[in-house]
Amino acid sequence: MKIIMLGAPGAGKGTQAKMIADKYVIPHISTGDIFRANIKNGTALGMEAKGYMDQGMLVPDELTVKILLDRVAQEDCKNGYVLDGFPRTIPQAEVLDKALTELNDKIDFAINVDVPDENIIRRMSGRRACLNCGATYHIAHVPPKTEGICDRCGNELILRDDDKEETVKNRLTVYHEQTQPLIDFYTAKGVLKDVDGTQDMQVVFDNIIACLEA
């Protein structure tokens, strides 16, 4: 079972990807993680990617797909995998699709965790973090006992730049321009499954499993 996770930043797709991977005992593959692993291990593909990254350039889609195919060819992927963070654009999806087709392979499901923008903004701008011990909170859902203070270590909590409302809105704009078209791409291939991501995490997960096992 080869699965791609789609959804806006903050939709919870990373959490769901991990839960799916745990249930089916298949790898949860993040392109960021495999880039780092290849660079750390000094592989030829990793060094090629590092050359682009060191110059502040984006790694070309063809190279990203090569690194990805190298990962999914490993023994632990023989029963499937969950892809998280790739593809993000139509050109990336097309390169991946072409490469998989040449291997007589394909994506079985694209799960779109659908959450309206206003919910995403509320979710992300309500996050608070402790830089000292790494604990995370949410002012509405998981508030600290004392406002602005970490329960665990007593340090001050901060709103990370990534979670500021303006940053979140900018990320959503990029998502709608670049990644939203993937929904049409995978709908046309007959593999897209839409799931309401506004519900409780376990309910979202149960609905995803129902789609995968229908």
Where are these regions (language model features)?
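Glycine-rich phosphate-binding loop of ATP-dependent small-molecule kinases
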Residues: 1-214
